[in-house]
Amino acid sequence: MMKYLNKDIWFKAPLIKPKITLNNNYFLVGKNRQTKWSITPNARIISHNYYVHDLSELREFESFFNDKKARVKSFFIPSHTKDIISLKAASGVTSFKVISSNKPFWIYNQTRHLIFNRKFASQVLDIKQIQDYEEIVLKDPLPFEIDKNTLIEELISVRFNRDEIEFIKSGAVGFKTNLDFKEVFYE
């Protein structure tokens, strides 16, 4: 299992794109809810559905869950989407240019870490807006060349959001489970 900042990275791919919700505070005005808008980071709740093919894979899920002591220890999960489309960058550089970064939402507000091709992870230090593109500055130099085909995912620091894990029998040998993760920022 790959580690980053002394935490495990869990690469198990969910069945479908995860459901992500934000925990915004709100107040009631009459019978209506009004969200308190804030530009500060909000802890996201990420819900993944998994299909477990056999008992050995089920035991892997259980041991990982028990190792993290449910809600106690944090770890990283990738976003399982190509979050950034990069322009070509050489190895050994600490910044790279991007044409697509989903800037209105996550890059300025949420993201702290990126993982490249599931081999190298680094912390995002700064994002600079330069005319038609953005430049992302990393803490560590890139160990390999990147281009538009490089898979660049957000790396999210999370904990399990429940104290138990439940598997439901599906078919002759498979099991289904749903895991909720809560984002943690400063651990």
What residues fall within each predicted segment?
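Extracellular/virion structural assembly segments
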Residues: 1-133, 138-187
